[in-house]
């Protein structure tokens, strides 16, 4: 059975007595940090930041990494495109304010990468996001293999150990 409350989602582990401990992601779990200003125009009729803005914040942070040639070398005939985006909304964000987006690569494949991100307001995680990003050949509009130097650079933004040596390649899911 799924948990009815999205606020309970996050990283879980068992304590020695078998009970569940909720451990949400921390900004320190992500090698890339991006700050975005929340605008009045970002609010919805409920007075909080619109869910579409969560996706825009993730996109801006993704592009800060993927479109910066000092970080990620790119072939001139290719570009990154998003193939999938999932967002788990864990809490509200409000204007005025700042949101910090933590980003990392969790897997680098032949022509794509899996990126996970989290949005933080005042140290509290408001959302987790996972995206699949594909390198596309501009001429054929089809997936293209990642060049070795691009793969190597992307791996530099992969998940750091979480303290016990395990990679942070999880994706929080509700229990069944």
Predicted regions and their residues:
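Terminal targeting signals and extreme-terminal segments of soluble enzymes
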Residues: 2-102, 106-176
């Amino acid at each position: 059975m799924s948990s009815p409350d999205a606020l309970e989602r996050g990283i879980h582990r068992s304590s020695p007595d078998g009970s569940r401990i909720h451990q949400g992601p921390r900004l320190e779990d992500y090698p890339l940090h991006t700050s975005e200003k929340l605008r009045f125009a970002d609010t919805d009729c409920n007075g909080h930041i619109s869910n579409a803005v969560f996706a825009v914040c993730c996109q801006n942070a993704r592009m800060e990494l993927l479109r910066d040639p000092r970080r990620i070398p790119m072939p001139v005939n290719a570009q990154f495109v998003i193939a999938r985006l999932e967002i788990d909304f864990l809490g509200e964000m409000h204007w005025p304010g700042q949101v910090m987006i933590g980003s990392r690569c969790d897997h680098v494949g032949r022509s794509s990468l899996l990126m996970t991100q989290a949005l933080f307001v005042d140290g509290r995680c408001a959302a987790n996001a996972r995206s699949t990003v594909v390198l596309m050949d501009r001429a054929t509009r089809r997936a293209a293999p990642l060049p070795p130097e691009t793969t190597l650079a992307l791996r530099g933004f992969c998940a750091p150990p979480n303290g016990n040596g395990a990679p942070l390649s999880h994706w929080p899911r509700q229990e069944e």
